[in-house]
A protein has these predicted regions:
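Conserved helicase motor "Helicase C" RecA-like lobe of SF1/SF2 P-loop NTPases
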Residues: 495-522
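Walker A/P-loop
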Residues: 39-58
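A contiguous, basic/glycine-rich beta-loop/short-helix subdomain that forms a polymer-engagement track
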Residues: 169-203, 218-220, 322-461, 470-477, ...
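Walker A/P-loop NTP-binding motif
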Residues: 35-36, 55-68, 85-89
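Conserved RecA-like P-loop NTPase helicase motor core
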Residues: 448, 460-470, 522-629
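Conserved pre-motif I regulatory segment
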Residues: 2-45
Length: 666
C-alpha cells in the first residue's frame, strides 16, 4: 500500500466513524481512485451505486491532498446533505487526522440571494407594481422584507420564508442587472457578495450544475478558483448545462423591459421599444393560437416562423438603440443610483441579446415554441465541445453517479460530458499545460446491496405495448392489483401528466374501499412535501411524473413497490432530443441507439433505483411495458438497471407483496 493510500484510508476511517458508519469496499476503492486522479491529474468517471457513500469517497481524498475542490450537484437536496449533514459531521474528525483547519461553503448564483438595493429602492419597478395589486402577494413581500432584516441570515432563497415566485423576483436581481458590491450602496451587506467571499477561501465549495455550466459556457469566472471539479449526480450534467444556456424570449419579459425603459428614460426610444413590445406580444399570441390548434406545428422549428421574424427584429433594434444610448449617456435615466441604471440596462440588454441570437438561428441550434407560457426557446444542439474546451482541459474532473453506464458501457455518458473516447480520443489537440480530455479512467465500484435477494423485477409479458393515449386499461388494472397486494406502499412513476391523471382516476375508483391514501402530484407541486407525506404514511400511494423518477429517497416499509408505466423514451416532439437523434441519423448512425435508448436507459435505472435504498429494504419494481422483454433493445435496458431477480409471473409477485405488506404490519 502506498503512503497516499494509507493516508486516504486513515482519513476515510475517521470520517466513516464520525458518522457512525462502517467501511465499504466500494467506498475505499473509489476514494483511492479519486486520490490517484488528483495526483496524476487525470479525469475519472465512477459509477457508485446507492449505499456506497460516494460523497465521503471524493471529499476525503481531496482534503488529504490539500486541494481546493468544487463540488457541483444537480439537486438542492444533495447540496443540503453535503453542507448541512456530511461536512459538519466529518470535518472535526478530519481536522484531527490531517492536523489543520478545514473550511467549506455553499455558493449559488446572484439570483438566489435577496438584493438589498432592489428591496430598498425608492424607484417604482414593474416587478414591484404587481405586488401591490394582489393582497396575498403584498403579505408575502412584507414577510420577506421582515426576514431580510433578521440578524445573521444568509439571504439565501432556500432559507427564506416560502413566497410567491413573483415576490422573489421583485426582491432579487440577475447577474446582468447586478452592478457589483463595489458600486452598490449595500455592497458591504450584500448577501451574494458575502457568500462569494466565504467561498473564495474555502477548501470545499458546494455549488450547482447550473452555475458551473454558465461559467463554462460564458468563459467568465463566477465561481472560486479550484484545483479539481467533482460532478456529483453527473448523469444530469449535460441536461443541466443545456438548460442553463437555453435562451428564452417571452412577451412578458419584453414588455417588462419596455416598461422599465419608459420609467427611466421616457422619450422616442422608449416609445419605439414599447410599440415593438406590443407588436411582439400580439404576434406571439396569434402564433400560440395557431400552435394549439395544429398539432403538427408543435415541436422543433426548422426556421423562425414568418409571423414572428419581423416582430423579433424590431424588438432587437429598439432594445439595442436604448442600450447604446445608456452606454453613451450615463445620466440618461436621471439622477438615480448606478445600481438602478444597471438593472434597467441589464434587463433591456438581456432582451436584445436573446432576440439577436434567435435571429441568427444556425444548424447547431434548436428553436422551439412552448405554448403553455408562450415562450420561444433557443438551445445548443450539443454542449460537449464547450465542456471539453472550458472544463476538461483545465482541472481534473471527477464525475460520479449511481447511473453512468448504458448496457454496462460508460461511453454514451462520457461523450455527453465532453470526454473523448474510442476513435475520438486519437484526435485530441491539447496544449502542454492542459489536461487531456481523453485521459479518463472509468470505474464501477458496484453497490453494497444484495439486489438479487432484496428485490424483484416484474416484467409482465401479457400487457399491450403502450400507445399515445396514456396507459391502457390493462396497465391500470395491473397497477391496481399490485397496489392492492402491497397494501399501498407504492411509488407509481409515469412518463406523462396524462398517465398520472388516468391512474389517479382509476385508482380512486378501484381502491375506494381499501385503507389506502392516494397522493397525486399536480402541476407545479414541490416534490419535497409530497415525498414527506408519502414516507410518513406506510399505506399511501404516491403517483407522479418525471420529477419523481430521480432523487426520491424513502427507505423502509413506506415503499415496497415501484411501478413504472412505460419505458421513458424521449417524446417525438421533444425538441432538443429529437434534433440530436436526427443529427445522428443524418451522420449515418442511429438516433434511436445513440440518443433515445441511452436516455431511456438512464432514466429507467434512476426510476428502478427508488426501491432499494438501504440494506434492509425489500420490494418489487414493476415495469408495465412488455417491450422490455419482447424487443431486442430490452437487454440494453436491463443491463443498465440494478440486478434484481427477474420474473414475469404476476401470481408470484403479488404473493411476495402480500407477505412484505403483512411483515410491515407485524
Amino acid at each position: 500500500m502506498s503512503e497516499l493510500s494509507a493516508q486516504v484510508r486513515k482519513a476515510l476511517d475517521a470520517a466513516v466513524t464520525a458518522i457512525g458508519g462502517s467501511p465499504r469496499d466500494g467506498q475505499i476503492e473509489m476514494a483511492e481512485a479519486v486520490a490517484n486522479a488528483l495526483t496524476d491529474r487525470h479525469h475519472l468517471m465512477v459509477q457508485a451505486g446507492t449505499g456506497t457513500g460516494k460523497s465521503l469517497a471524493y471529499i476525503v481524498p481531496a482534503l488529504v491532498h490539500g486541494r481546493k475542490v468544487l463540488v457541483a450537484t444537480a439537486t438542492l437536496a444533495l447540496q443540503r446533505q453535503l453542507v448541512e449533514r456530511d461536512l459538519p459531521a466529518v470535518v472535526p474528525a478530519l481536522e484531527k487526522v490531517l492536523g489543520r483547519d478545514i473550511t467549506y461553503a455553499i455558493y449559488k448564483g446572484v439570483g438566489n440571494y435577496i438584493c438589498l438595493q432592489k428591496m430598498n429602492s425608492t424607484e417604482d419597478d414593474p416587478d414591484g407594481e404587481v405586488l401591490l395589486e394582489v393582497s396575498s402577494l403584498g403579505k408575502d413581500a412584507q414577510r420577506l422584507h421582515a426576514w431580510a432584516k433578521t440578524p445573521g441570515i444568509t439571504g439565501d432563497r432556500d432559507d427564506a420564508p416560502e413566497v410567491d415566485r413573483r415576490v422573489w423576483l421583485a426582491n432579487s436581481t440577475s447577474g446582468r442587472e447586478c452592478v457589483g458590491a463595489d458600486n452598490c450602496n449595500y455592497g458591504s451587506q450584500c448577501f451574494a457578495a458575502n457568500a462569494k467571499a466565504k467561498a473564495q477561501s474555502a477548501d470545499v465549495v458546494v455549488t450547482n450544475h447550473t452555475l458551473l455550466a454558465i461559467e463554462i459556457v460564458d468563459s467568465h469566472p463566477i465561481l472560486p478558483e479550484r484545483d479539481a471539479v467533482i460532478l456529483d449526480e453527473a448523469h444530469e450534467f449535460m441536461d443541466r448545462t443545456t438548460q442553463a444556456v437555453t435562451e428564452e424570449l417571452t412577451s412578458a419579459r419584453v414588455i417588462r423591459a419596455a416598461a422599465m425603459a419608459r420609467k427611466y428614460m421616457p422619450g422616442k426610444l422608449a416609445d419605439a421599444f414599447t410599440k415593438a413590445a406590443d407588436n411582439f406580444h400580439d404576434a406571439m399570441t396569434d402564433y400560440g393560437d395557431h400552435v394549439r390548434s395544429d398539432f403538427s406545428a408543435q415541436g422543433r422549428l426548422e426556421e423562425i416562423p414568418s409571423v414572428l421574424e419581423s416582430p423579433i427584429r424590431k424588438v432587437r433594434e429598439a432594445a439595442q438603440a436604448i442600450t447604446q444610448s445608456l452606454t453613451a449617456d450615463e445620466e440618461a435615466i436621471g439622477t438615480d443610483a448606478m445600481a438602478e441604471r444597471a438593472r434597467v440596462k441589464g434587463a433591456i440588454t438581456e432582451v436584445s441579446t436573446t432576440a439577436a441570437k434567435i435571429l441568427k438561428l444556425g444548424n447547431g441550434q434548436v428553436l422551439w415554441y412552448e405554448p403553455t407560457f408562450s415562450t420561444l426557446h433557443l438551445a445548443p444542439l450539443s454542449v460537449s465541445h464547450v465542456l471539453r474546451s472550458n472544463l476538461l482541459t483545465q482541472t481534473p474532473v471527477i464525475a460520479t453517479s449511481a447511473t453512468l453506464t448504458v448496457g454496462n458501457n460508460f461511453d454514451a455518458m462520457a461523450k455527453s460530458i465532453g470526454f473523448l473516447v474510442g476513435n475520438d480520443a486519437d484526435v485530441a489537440e491539447i496544449a502542454d499545460d492542459e489536461i487531456d480530455p481523453a485521459n479518463v479512467q472509468m470505474l464501477d465500484v458496484g453497490s453494497p446491496f444484495d439486489f438479487a435477494n432484496q428485490g424483484v423485477l416484474y416484467m409482465p409479458k401479457h400487457l399491450p405495448e403502450p400507445g399515445r393515449d396514456g396507459p391502457s386499461a390493462e396497465v391500470l388494472t395491473e397497477l391496481g392489483e399490485l397496489i392492492d397486494a402491497a397494501g399501498g406502499r407504492t411509488l407509481a412513476l409515469f412518463s406523462s401528466w396524462r398517465g398520472v391523471e388516468a391512474a389517479d382516476l382509476h385508482l380512486r375508483k378501484v381502491l375506494v374501499d381499501l385503507p389506502i391514501k392516494i397522493i397525486t402530484q399536480k402541476r407545479g407541486d414541490s416534490v419535497g412535501p409530497l415525498v414527506e407525506r408519502f414516507a410518513k404514511d406506510e399505506t399511501s400511494v404516491l403517483i407522479g411524473t418525471m420529477s419523481l423518477w430521480q432523487g426520491v429517497d424513502v427507505p423502509g416499509d413506506s415503499c415496497i413497490l415501484v411501478a413504472i408505466d412505460r419505458i421513458p423514451f424521449p417524446r417525438p416532439d421533444e425538441p432538443v432530443m429529437s434534433a440530436r437523434a436526427s443529427q445522428a441519423d443524418e451522420a449515418g448512425g442511429s438516433g434511436f441507439m445513440q440518443v433515445s435508448l441511452p436516455r431511456a436507459a438512464l432514466l429507467l435505472a434512476q426510476g428502478t433505483g427508488r426501491l432499494i435504498r438501504s440494506v434492509d429494504d425489500r420490494g418489487v419494481v414493476a415495469i408495465l411495458d412488455s417491450r422490455i422483454v419482447t424487443k431486442r433493445y430490452g437487454s440494453v435496458l436491463l443491463n443498465s438497471m440494478p440486478p434484481l431477480w427477474r420474473t414475469s409471473d404476476g401470481t408470484v409477485v403479488r404473493e411476495s407483496l402480500r407477505r412484505l405488506a403483512q411483515k410491515s404490519k407485524d
